Design a protein with these regions (language model features):
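Predominantly soluble domains enriched in secretory-pathway, periplasmic, or organellar proteins
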Residues: 38-394
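Bacterial N-terminal signal peptides
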Residues: 25-37
Length: 394
């Protein structure tokens, strides 16, 4: 029986030894976690998001305030976000003039502002940056709205949106910037908006809000070269100019913006009614993808690294997308309602967002850090902050 007793004792001793070994290992593991956290990568740990830091430069942005007839110059830097000065614009002292669109010249010497209201036509104004001194202005069509400028600064393209008139085809005004002369008025579609040129300056795109289409203008001929139907399930590219109007009851997209990609190979169109974005291939003139967006997606802007910033007019928010996949990378709430425009700084660090507000609310300018995808600053502006463009860095 002795061998059996010895065997039992040996077994118990081995068990006790295994227990001690396990306890020592557990203790060592605990010490490692407590005092050397970088030595072991825990499966559930995620890298921390980068924290926003104060800007090392000053960024200056112009914003037009539609109900206040004001142009605001805003500075964002290490001291925060503040309004540098405001300038009144318009000819009618007793009525709202309604500045809506704005574009800064490539040489940063001038800004061009579309003014929607007139008697009856609206106008576009040329001012000198910094002083905001008026150089000259010229009359255009009914409610000139979104404005863009050619890469060489020679022409501005203004969408005559005709927001308050009859539902009839309107136009894009082409204005020579040196003498502020309208050289061509190109009939496109009903309620054009979202006037944007491709980076090469060879094609102009605008959204046709009441025709569910996007129009393309060849800037060499100043004629409509193609159009693209955007209705859900009816997406189709066509050549030439459109020859008929849509019925109001048939509208499913109601596009408000057409934004070319950084290389001009794609155009992204915001469908304000259906809350999605349509990506169109410029070469084949076919739809590449259609992806969900925020409530009332309105204006679009490209970051320098190819992300797409979208303002959600009804959704009181701003979305950032990977437009190649349609994945929403972030959705940021805004301080006030009726989110309007977006512009990205040349160094790709920040996006500035204009918010109109409702009723007696002031307008707002908000700043998004594009590295952290967080809102880092806000400032009140005069009522109905609308179009905006970047001026310069200091």
């Amino acid at each position: 029986m002795t061998p059996n007793v010895c065997l039992a004792s040996d077994t118990q001793e081995r068990q006790r030894g295994s227990t001690r070994t396990a306890r020592i290992a557990a203790f060592a593991f605990l010490i490692c976690i407590l005092f050397w956290p970088c030595a072991i990568a825990m499966p559930h740990e995620r890298p921390k998001a980068p924290e926003s830091t104060a800007p090392t430069k000053d960024y200056l942005v112009y914003v037009v305030c539609e109900s206040a007839d004001k142009i605001a110059l805003v500075r964002f830097g290490a001291q925060g976000l503040r309004v540098e000065h405001e300038t009144h614009i318009g000819l009618m002292p007793m009525d709202i003039n309604g500045p809506h669109g704005i574009a800064v010249s490539p040489d940063k010497q001038f800004l061009y502002v579309s003014v929607g209201h007139g008697r009856p036509d609206g106008s576009v104004w040329k001012l000198r940056t910094g002083t905001d001194k008026v150089v000259r202005y010229t009359s255009l069509g009914l409610f000139p709205a979104t404005t863009d400028i050619s890469p060489d600064g020679a022409f501005i393209y203004v969408a005559n949106a005709n927001f308050h008139g009859d539902m009839v085809p309107s136009s894009i005004s082409v204005v020579a910037t040196d003498e502020m002369v309208e050289v061509r008025r190109v009939t496109t579609c009903t309620m054009p908006h979202g006037s944007r040129l491709n980076p090469q300056g060879t094609k102009h795109y605008s959204a046709c809000m009441m025709d569910d289409m996007m129009a393309e203008i060849d800037t060499r001929t100043f004629q409509v070269s193609r159009y693209f139907m955007l209705g859900t399930g009816k997406e189709m590219g066509m050549t030439g100019a459109p020859d008929k109007q849509m019925k109001m009851g048939d509208l499913t997209c109601v596009p408000t913006w057409a934004q070319p990609s950084n290389d001009g190979s794609e155009v992204y169109v915001a469908c304000n009614k259906s809350n999605d974005i349509v990506a169109v291939d410029v070469a084949t003139w076919k739809m590449l993808r259609r992806f969900r967006a925020g409530d009332g997606v309105y204006n679009l802007a490209m970051t320098k690294d190819g992300r797409l910033v979208a303002t959600n007019k009804r959704g009181q928010s701003v979305s950032v997308f990977d437009p190649k996949t349609g994945k929403e990378l972030a959705r940021l709430p805004t301080q006030r309602k009726v989110v309007h425009g977006a512009v990205v700084t040349p160094d790709n660090h920040f996006a500035f967002i204009s918010v109109e507000g409702v009723g007696s609310d002031p307008g707002t300018l908000e700043v998004i850090d594009l590295d952290t995808l967080k809102t880092v600053a806000t400032v009140d502006l005069p009522a109905q902050a609308a179009g905006l463009d970047f001026w310069k860095m200091e």
